[in-house]
Amino acid sequence: MSKDKALLRINQLKEQLNLWSKQYYVDDNPSVDDTEYDLALKELISLETLYPELITSDSPSQKVGGMVSEKFLKITHKTPMLSLGNVFSFDEFLDFNTQISKISNTLDNQYVAELKIDGLSISLVYENGSLVSAATRGNGVVGEDVTINARTIKSIPLKISKKERVEVRGEIYLSKAEFEKINQKRLLNNEDLFINPRNAAAGTLRQLDSKIVASRNLDAFLYYYISDDSNNLTQYQSILKLNELGFKTNKETMLCKNLDEIKAYIDKYTNLKNDLDYQIDGIVFKINDKNLQNSLGFTSKIPKWAIAYKFPAEIKQTKLLDIFATVGRTGKITYNAKLEPVFLMGAKISAATLNNAEYIKTKDLRINSIVKIKKAGDVIPEVIEAIKDEDFYKLEKFKPALYCPNCHSLLEKNENEVDQFCINSSCSMKILRSLQHFSSREAMNIVSLGDRSLEILFNLKIIQNISDIYKLEEYKDQILAIDNFGLKSYLNLIDSINMSKNNSLEKVLFGLGIRHIGSKTAKILARKYQNIDNLMSASYDELIQINSIGESLALSIIDWFKIEDNLKLIDELKSFNINFNYLGAKINSDSIIANKSFVITGTLTRPREEFKTLIENNAGKVIGSISKQTDYLLAGNNVGSKLEKAKKLGVKIIDEQQFFDLLKSEKG
């Protein structure tokens, strides 16, 4: 593949992986299974290996994972909460063990085997025997402060006997039984149902009301111990130490002394995983010997002494009862499968996504055929293929829909696109989905206006367009008359709506639903133009000069602001005092480091994210690897091979003080 084609594909993969990552870690609403994510990440890494000069610091290959919400205070982890490498078969685990043996000089390495709980990672810090902080993983460097909520979890002790500073890490989760109870209650209250236990656990831990957290019976398994004596203990002894201090650990954890025991452990829980009362998505194997752990060390992303074995996707056969279409906020038509119910990964499955008509044609899926479905992780199941037996060919071939399933307008399909679209601006389902998008967490974050509540208000004609959201106080009596919608719910709704008025420009820009503008592009445009009026005045030629803004996106922006109804909406939102200014740091385009590229290496006195932010706020960019095109290597202590490579290529090397001096100097 040529470098230009590789760059194009890398950018596509980065955007897709970052979106999937955000959906999983921030929105708690994954849209793809782990297998699809891992394959895309693998493709990205292979392309970046081929062209290392194309690696950037925002690449998913360089990230620990997750992102930090804006709802809680932030806590910087003293030791970064890293991700884990993955293997997908026992053979791949053997390859991992072979790499370990190059340091340990034996293939019989001892591992601690832990079930990989599908929950939310947590870091607990104790000082003088008291719990002083609890933080989520966040982006691995900075997490969310959830101390008040963590205190309500019965399996997290508020006091321990050890007086020295202790950090304990583990996983917050919700049992399957508690998950069912919560969803039953939400169903009775006309609230949106949680997708899965992980989604429910994450949503609960991020509640602002700790009483709600306490009522949902979150649980925790702890597995990682950091203190003054932790280096003197093996990994398994650390688990025993946690038990001794009163922490709940997983009783299924086992010290495996050889490869046979590891294989037996994998086989056992591959078969038993659905019988547990909590969800797991794999097994984590950690080297037991701490000295060997220290010798193996870390990459910037993962420990070299631990690996996650991921269970293969579960596949079952069932009958495809029907294929039906739905319409989204942009008018895009999505096809779905109605299935004969079947149990898969402990859940009853009766539907699956089929994406678009081209997907169905390619797989030649037919109504009443027997199909294979798979489910890896906790997302919507996927139809893999039809069983093409003798009966299959007697069935009628699939025919794409001609009309919108909601408003019955004729569908359109561009020659170069696989998707069909409803272009009727009055389509009620498009309008409802647009409203739900506007109020979503990633957009305006109107937390008390969930999809179900919005649908009820939409059907009652109380909300028919975006500006109606900000008129709800006029409908107080009508809203209070709705079943299960009391005064407290109403007041929370009004508070959420009023809070949304103070969002930064990128939030409302994303919420408006301009085609091709995702959350990342909205942030780029907001930082560039600072307010909505400047963006409205931008020309096509000006827009396409912005990095990552292509022709179709530039045209989409220009066309959107030409529509009279859209301009009227902006004016109405301004009349409700919606903020249309960018509230983030302003980019200093006149900085001496504008358009300069930096690679950061070694241990610094401040978090790397802080240096990255400083560079980006001064119009510079941070990349992942050294090349001839790199302008500066910012080097801390304990630097690795990047320093030698920079010297060899003649890249300017600076330390922290020189970096700050550079920022203070004027452009010549």
From Swiss-Prot:
Gene3D superfamilies: 5' to 3' exonuclease, C-terminal subdomain (1.10.150.20), BRCT domain (3.40.50.10190), DNA ligase/mRNA capping enzyme (3.30.470.30), Helix hairpin bin (1.10.287.610), Nucleic acid-binding proteins (2.40.50.140). This is DNA ligase. It catalyses: NAD(+) + (deoxyribonucleotide)n-3'-hydroxyl + 5'-phospho-(deoxyribonucleotide)m = (deoxyribonucleotide)n+m + AMP + beta-nicotinamide D-nucleotide. Signal peptide: none annotated. Its cofactor is Mg(2+); Mn(2+). NAD(+) binds at residues 34-38, 83-84, 114, 137, 171, 286, 310. The keyword Lipoprotein does not apply. The gene is ligA. Residues 588-668 form the BRCT domain. It comes from the Bacteria. One of its GO terms (biological process) is DNA replication. Belongs to the NAD-dependent DNA ligase family. LigA subfamily. Zn(2+) binds at residues 404, 407, 422, 427. One of its GO terms (cellular component) is cytosol. It is an enzyme of class 6 (ligase). DNA ligase that catalyzes the formation of phosphodiester linkages between 5'-phosphoryl and 3'-hydroxyl groups in double-stranded DNA using NAD as a coenzyme and as the energy source for the reaction. It is essential for DNA replication and repair of damaged DNA. The active site is at residue 116. SMART domains: BRCT, LIGANc. SUPFAM superfamilies: BRCT domain (SSF52113), DNA ligase/mRNA capping enzyme, catalytic domain (SSF56091), Nucleic acid-binding proteins (SSF50249), RuvA domain 2-like (SSF47781).
